[in-house]
């Protein structure tokens, strides 16, 4: 940048537009010296951009080629050197030329064909670190200028906008000020200093924003709201805008725009937001096929008959006739139960008798018409049987089954004996009575402990009582006096002596000194006088 060490701070702030914005220092630029933006003179003050100082008309430059050209003529004027047609904001060219030429008073030897003058742009370190070539081919169209005026280029490449540095973080044409509190940001109002009123500058700002977000070359006239607030509608303006029939070549063409580049592939960038193609997964009943999809998509269609079916009429809804017919055809592929009870469409390999699924299905369908078969097919609801379901006791003493009027007997619960084997009816009166007196004590104890709750246990207890064995209710054992030993003490209520206890766990008799109270002994079991035990008689 141009050093003005001899001037005061107020004079520095009153430099002309070109002297504040584009100050020339070709030596630093040609030698490739990098700068990290430490020089504050490269930043301009927006409030003092355009005041005119007649005594500061001419600016000394290190080289004659570093003189600034007429800004309006080179950027917005008749670009005859490039051979490119006028476009965009050409109607504002005289005003731009007039306002800029009055404020700059450039030397006469600088012509529009000279191109964009050499400007000392402070760029970050680039891989090449070389000399930036400046020639007429680096002339910019007005849309590229718009990308450089305070708006970061989408490609961040100065070479694509006319002044280029291959570094992505290079600044644009007009250097933007740093984010400092004392600096004023570049706004739309400052654009009026270039010969445009505020409305024209606002329209230009919108068009520049549209170019940046849409990736176009500025060939359409877009006005209204800033598209950065509506990124989802960015692609729609490509079709709705009125384009120039002969647009200039856009250096950003072919690049994917930032808006929607993550969620949309490159081949769908020109499509509007619509659902004419199924953007959402279809319902199971839909067999719609996207014409842009490959033929392999037909493999994912559900088809029970083994044939691939597709429809180009769109998805079918349940109310359509075709879908109803298709559903009926699919239902006929399963097992069908006719009203007369016959079963058709039985798959191969399925059991067809009454013991398989076909028999169960037939039985259930028959139970729907015959209420008497509900208990056989589906079972009974226990809450309707009048039983106490919270009782921990067994149900069989009181409830046999829903069809039985009396409880089951114990011998009829565990198993069922065919009538051919029930011979006790014929021989019950011919069998001799059992005489337990013939058996020893060991067998009697076996009958007592192994036939709990049976009459045989009661008969064995009677026989043991007859043999001077007594059952102690507290000790729950059988005791008897030791043979040949009298009690050492005997009263009307108790006695003391040596007794034999029968140990059922070790199956033996154990002698023990014991104080016996008579009221704790079990009485003799009571049996009918005419009772003559015969196990065969207890079969029924």
Swiss-Prot record:
Tissue spec: Ubiquitous. Highly expressed in brain, heart, thymus, spleen, kidney, liver, small intestine, placenta, lung and peripheral blood leukocytes.
GO CC terms of this entry: CCR4-NOT complex; CCR4-NOT core complex; cytoplasm; cytosol; membrane; nucleoplasm; nucleus; P-body
Extent of Polar residues compositional bias: 96-123, 289-313, 321-333
First-listed, main subcellular location of the protein, grouped into a coarse class: cytoplasm
Sequence positions bearing Phosphoserine: 126, 157, 165, 169, 242, 274
Chain residue ranges for the region called Repressor domain: 437-540
UniProt record, GO biological process: negative regulation of intracellular estrogen receptor signaling pathway; negative regulation of transcription by RNA polymerase II; nuclear-transcribed mRNA poly(A) tail shortening; positive regulation of cytoplasmic mRNA processing body assembly; regulation of stem cell population maintenance; regulation of transcription by RNA polymerase II; regulation of translation; regulatory ncRNA-mediated gene silencing
Chain intervals for the UniProt region annotation (Disordered): 96-126, 276-342
Positions of modified residues (Phosphothreonine): 93
GO molecular function: transcription coregulator activity; transcription corepressor binding
Record bears the keyword Cytoplasm: yes
Annotated keywords: Cytoplasm, Developmental protein, Disease variant, Intellectual disability, Nucleus, Phosphoprotein, Repressor, RNA-mediated gene silencing, Transcription, Transcription regulation, Translation regulation
InterPro entries attached to this UniProt entry: CCR4-NOT_su2/3/5_C_sf, Not2/3/5, NOT2/3/5_C
Localization in the cell: Cytoplasm; Nucleus
Entry keyword annotation includes Repressor: yes
Subunit structure: Component of the CCR4-NOT complex; distinct complexes seem to exist that differ in the participation of probably mutually exclusive catalytic subunits. In the complex interacts directly with CNOT3. Interacts with NCOR1, NCOR2. HDAC3 and GPS2.
Disease note: Intellectual developmental disorder with nasal speech, dysmorphic facies, and variable skeletal anomalies: An autosomal dominant disorder characterized by delayed development, speech delay with nasal speech, and characteristic facial features including upslanted palpebral fissures, anteverted nares, a thin upper lip, and micrognathia. Some patients may have skeletal anomalies, such as brachydactyly, toe syndactyly and flat feet.
Function comment: Component of the CCR4-NOT complex which is one of the major cellular mRNA deadenylases and is linked to various cellular processes including bulk mRNA degradation, miRNA-mediated repression, translational repression during translational initiation and general transcription regulation. Additional complex functions may be a consequence of its influence on mRNA expression. Required for the CCR4-NOT complex structural integrity.
Family affiliation: Belongs to the CNOT2/3/5 family.
Name of this chain's protein: CCR4-NOT transcription complex subunit 2
Naturally occurring in which organism (per UniProt): Homo sapiens (Human)
